[in-house]
């Protein structure tokens, strides 16, 4: 199991990044959340098997078709098992 905290920079708001990330994470069987930040970045926490988390990170580097990802800050965290689904949260 693996858990990551990710900050995605670039043109990632207003391009369906959150919805697309949530869909991809759910397809991969991951739990966690994604939300927009006031500074224009997207923040997400994902938890699940390591291979699926790595697949989501690879997707995050590209994002949906209209996104232009310029940076990805990834930090591994302790697995907690606190989530039951992957959710899109309200903006901060």
Curated annotation (Swiss-Prot):
| Keyword match DNA damage | no
The protein's Enzyme Commission number: 3.6.1.7
Q: Name one GO molecular function term.
A: acylphosphatase activity
Q: Which UniProt keywords apply?
A: Hydrolase
Matching entries from Pfam families are given as: Acylphosphatase
Reactions mediated catalytically:
an acyl phosphate + H2O = a carboxylate + phosphate + H(+)
TM regions (residue ranges): none
**Active site, UniProt feature:** 18, 36
Instruction: Answer yes or no on keyword Membrane.
Output: no
What top-level branch of life does the organism fall under?
Answer: Bacteria
Which of the seven top EC classes does this enzyme belong to? hydrolase
Q: Cite the Acylphosphatase-like domain residue spans from the record.
A: 3-90
Record family assignment: Belongs to the acylphosphatase family.
Q: What is this protein called?
A: Acylphosphatase
Q: Gene for this protein?
A: acyP
């Amino acid at each position: 199991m693996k858990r990551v905290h990710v900050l995605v920079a670039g043109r990632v708001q207003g391009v369906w990044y959150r919805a697309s990330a949530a869909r991809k994470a759910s397809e991969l069987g991951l739990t966690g959340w994604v939300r927009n930040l006031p500074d224009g970045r997207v923040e997400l926490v994902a938890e699940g098997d390591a291979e699926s988390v790595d697949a989501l990170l690879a997707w995050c580097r590209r994002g949906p078709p209209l996104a232009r990802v310029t940076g990805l800050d990834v930090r591994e965290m302790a697995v907690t098992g606190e989530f039951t689904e992957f959710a899109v949260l309200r903006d901060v």
